[in-house]
Amino acid sequence: MSQNNEDIILEVQNLTKYFDTPKGKLHAVDGVNFKIKKGTTLGIVGESGCGKSTTGRTILKLTEPTGGRIIFDGEDITDYKPGKMRKLRTEMSIIFQDPFSSLDPRQSVMQLISEPLIEHKIYKTKDEIKKQTLALMDTVGLARRFVNSYPHELDGGRRQRIGIARALAVNPKLIVCDEPVSALDVSIQAQILNLLRQLQKDMGLTYIFITHDLSVVKYFSDEIAVMYLGQMVEKATSDELFDNPIHPYTKALLSAIPLPVVGKEKKERKLITGEVTSPVNLPDICRFLSRCDECKESWPHQCHSEICRGSG
């Protein structure tokens, strides 16, 4: 389906991020391409170390890209210096994985939520700042009685609500959700996911939702990108990816999801065996080759390097 460029809030072209190590360059993000429509969610899923969090941080320029282009809301921001990026910080935000380690333990809830409002001069008077801070607490479902509490006095769910309120404080268009529920109990996870979905509906937010949990990403995402060793190996709508996975790595990930067994039918699991290729000085071949039976049988004649369906 063709798309109007005005519908695209973020386009990433051949994004790379390499880190120097004593043994050579570590390919954390290597040639990533995608687009996101306004008001939708792109889920990025993969094993630990695949580069999904680095992708999110590089898009926000919390770490500088090695190469490629980042086009946000029609502007190429790739070469923006810190001063120019500062103005964009009110349009792009992040929710971190661990709400405890990402919050200053010396600050109260009032101080934590009001900090972005003060930092970006969104409100000037103390009364305005206090009023908006309380409004943000209401928005994320954090009772006002906790306004003078400190992070260590709250449970994980309430701490994550503080993180969400901080992200919302600048009234962003795009939020990178970096494993926002992985540190929470399952019952609390559902509450936070429902909150994020409601906020998206009410405020028209666009999310990049980073996770290793396939059941969560299916529930939460419009499109899903699967990453392996710095590359997006497959991208499709949520339904397409789960109903008809194409890349062998995607098939193996989906096969590992525990499902209830009905009657005597039992789903055959595709176990991933073999050693993970080192991300340092990667050869120019399929990175899943050492762990993929399909690749071993057909390489080099037919190798699944990247499969993209959907918005590109």
Predicted regions and their residues:
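Charged, flexible cofactor/metal-binding loops and thiol motifs
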Residues: 3-8, 25, 237-312
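P-loop NTP-binding/switch modules centered on Walker-like glycine-rich loops
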Residues: 47, 176, 180, 184, ...
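Helix-to-loop junction immediately C-terminal to a conserved catalytic motif
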Residues: 60
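Conserved ABC transporter NBD signature motif
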Residues: 68-76, 310
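Conserved ABC ATPase "signature" region
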Residues: 76, 118, 127-145, 254-255
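Conserved ABC ATPase signature
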Residues: 150-154, 158
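A short, proline-enriched helix->beta-strand linker immediately N-terminal to the Walker B motif
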Residues: 169-173
